[in-house]
From Swiss-Prot:
<dbReference type="InterPro" id="IPR004529">
    <property type="entry name" value="Phe-tRNA-synth_IIc_asu"/>
</dbReference>
<feature type="binding site">
    <location>
        <position position="412"/>
    </location>
    <ligand>
        <name>Mg(2+)</name>
    </ligand>
</feature>
<feature type="binding site">
    <location>
        <begin position="371"/>
        <end position="373"/>
    </location>
    <ligand>
        <name>L-phenylalanine</name>
    </ligand>
</feature>
<keyword id="KW-0030">Aminoacyl-tRNA synthetase</keyword>
<dbReference type="Pfam" id="PF01409">
    <property type="entry name" value="tRNA-synt_2d"/>
</dbReference>
<feature type="binding site">
    <location>
        <position position="332"/>
    </location>
    <ligand>
        <name>L-phenylalanine</name>
    </ligand>
</feature>
<keyword id="KW-0436">Ligase</keyword>
<keyword id="KW-0067">ATP-binding</keyword>
<dbReference type="InterPro" id="IPR045864">
    <property type="entry name" value="aa-tRNA-synth_II/BPL/LPL"/>
</dbReference>
<keyword id="KW-0963">Cytoplasm</keyword>
<dbReference type="GO" id="GO:0000287">
    <property type="term" value="F:magnesium ion binding"/>
</dbReference>
<dbReference type="InterPro" id="IPR036390">
    <property type="entry name" value="WH_DNA-bd_sf"/>
</dbReference>
<dbReference type="GO" id="GO:0005524">
    <property type="term" value="F:ATP binding"/>
</dbReference>
<dbReference type="InterPro" id="IPR006195">
    <property type="entry name" value="aa-tRNA-synth_II"/>
</dbReference>
<dbReference type="GO" id="GO:0006432">
    <property type="term" value="P:phenylalanyl-tRNA aminoacylation"/>
</dbReference>
<dbReference type="InterPro" id="IPR002319">
    <property type="entry name" value="Phenylalanyl-tRNA_Synthase"/>
</dbReference>
<dbReference type="GO" id="GO:0004826">
    <property type="term" value="F:phenylalanine-tRNA ligase activity"/>
</dbReference>
Amino acid sequence: MEVTLSQGEYRLLKLMAERGFREGTLEEASKILGVDKSSLASLSNLLAEKGVVEVEERVEEHYVLTERGRDALERGLPEEKLVLFLAGRGGEASVEEVRRALGEEAGIALGQAARKGLVVIAGGVVRLAVDQAEALKTITPLKKLLENVASGSKPTVGDELLREALSRGLIRREARRSIVLRLKVNPAEALARARVEAAVLTRDMLKSGEWRRLRFKPYNVKAEPPRVLPARRHFLAEFIERLRDILRELGFREVRGPLVELELFNFDVLFQAQDHPAREIHDSLWIKSPRRGDLSGYSDLVERVASVHERGWKYRWSPEVASRYILRSQTTAVSARILATRPNPPARFFTVGKVFRSDAVGPTRLPEFHQLDGIEGDEGYTFRDLLGRLDEIASMLGLKLKFKPAYFPFTEPSVEGYVKLPNGRWLELFGAGMFRPEVLEAVGVDYPVGAWGFGIERLAMAFYGVSDIRKLYTRNVDEVREMRVRWL
């Protein structure tokens, strides 16, 4: 029967014929033929498909020493140590002395020695029941078994000693897989009838004219090339970076702030009353230790904030409340810190970072998520300028935007921004407005400032067509690789 072989298959079959190989494991064949195991396995499977070679996978059970077994072989079995200890003490010792001498192994040693009739335990005293030589002779077979396992010898299955060694965790079973190659044809005859098929046309073939005598393997020019899967950033990180790029292009400078924040910047500077419900423990996450920070470095700011609160909210403002540490609940705290430095106009800043709320994990909410906050201010800056800027940002994201009047504690006038989804629904995305005079007075800024902020995950869910916010944090490599923007 004629068989078509590749050049690699032909060379392997020729090696088998020349070196007399008929049957053996993959490792043995690799040594005999001088072919690396990876290439040998690949070519053997191809020859098996053509009925030339049989490839058999064998699974054999082996026994190996555990760490406890190696320790017993090197330092002695627990019962062996007990026998030697008692022999050195005249044949007996108290149970307490044995425990001190053998430590954690005392219980195993006493149990095994008593079971094998090597010791007698009575009245808190342990005595040798046989002489030292007889006791060690009883223990020797088990040690011999461990030595055989260590050397690679296969113990007799069903042996009582084998069961004991397994139950005591001295040895363990291991399944070892091996591949056996077996020729199904006479290699010399197969070579004589073989038709060699070349896969590559080389320069030497053209030069020598050998190509005229060869049969070439046909190529499927419509076959798809192998899919290349290069590394990529997590899609949520890519989305956040896109938002950063847009704001940088518009002339905004990114700023950062601490995750553990003073209530002074998270609430008080923003004219949020100290008895506001958002400050309660069911909404904010307070720090246990240290509970409070030092406000001495913000004396001027504290004085202005106190004056604004006491005049506006009609209560006695407490620096103790303002000095409490919390996990920041809004990135507007970073904007407050920046404004407190009294930047010269025009001021254009944004921040992207994590905020924390006392929320349960669910399909639409997380206790930890990202917010983007932006501020822009200048002499003569107006609410209309703010809306125009927001519309510009939305258009750069490919979004259609509309506004509705709204209320926020630290901006007036204020709006909510809605973007149109592909299904025609409008999604509430952000809040925006002009900082109230009380906020600007507290930070010492004398020009108008507009502000906006939104949850990044909320927008990302719409962009990627994700209905469960937890999917944005998937670590499944396939999901990360396949995630694509569904909106644009």
